[in-house]
Amino acid sequence: NNCPQDWLPMNGLCYKIFDELKAWKDAEMFCRKYKPGCHLASIILYGESPEWAEGHSEVWLGLWDKKKDFSWEWTDR
């Protein structure tokens, strides 16, 4: 486990929920500045229920429509 203290290790990655309210773009920029390689979370498997989101009613995910043409992409890919 190479995750920082208070981060949740899962499937070889590290997850952390931040409680500050932010717009989606601001949240993604916050993640990128927080630590190199960080992004909003991606859900890899269809129907995956990420345990890092349990107990939180609203979280941002890293899925976006960069080109504004309904071709959705994950920010970490």
UniProtKB/Swiss-Prot annotation:
Coiled-coil segments on the chain, per record: none
Gene Ontology MF annotations: carbohydrate binding; metal ion binding
Compartments (UniProt record): Secreted
Disulfide bonds: C3-C14
Summary of the tissues where the protein is detected: Expressed by the venom gland.
Keyword Iron attached: no
Superkingdom, taxonomy of origin: Eukaryota
Keywords: Calcium, Disulfide bond, Hemagglutinin, Lectin, Metal-binding, Secreted
C-type lectin domain residues: 10-77
Gene3D superfamilies named in the record: Mannose-Binding Protein A, subunit A (3.10.100.10)
Chief localisation class: secreted
Cellular component terms (Gene Ontology): extracellular region
Function: Lectin that displays hemagglutinating activity on all types of trypsinized human erythrocytes (A+, B+, AB+, and O+), with a higher sensitivity to AB+ type. Is inhibited by different carbohydrates with alpha-lactose displaying the most potent ability to block agglutination (followed by D-fucose, D-galactose, D-rhamnose, D-mannose, and D-sucrose). Is also inhibited by EDTA and pretreatment with heat. In addition, it induces significant cell death in HL-60 cells in a dose-dependent manner, with an IC(50) close to 250 ug/ml. Is a calcium-dependent lectin.
Family per record: Belongs to the true venom lectin family.
Further remarks about this protein from its record: Negative results: in contrast to B.atrox venom, does not induce edema in mouse paw nor does it induce mast cell degranulation (tested on RBL-2H3 cell line). Has no significant effect on plasma coagulation in vitro nor does it induce platelet aggregation.
Assembly behavior: Homodimer; disulfide-linked.
Name of this protein: C-type lectin galatrox
Record organism: Bothrops atrox
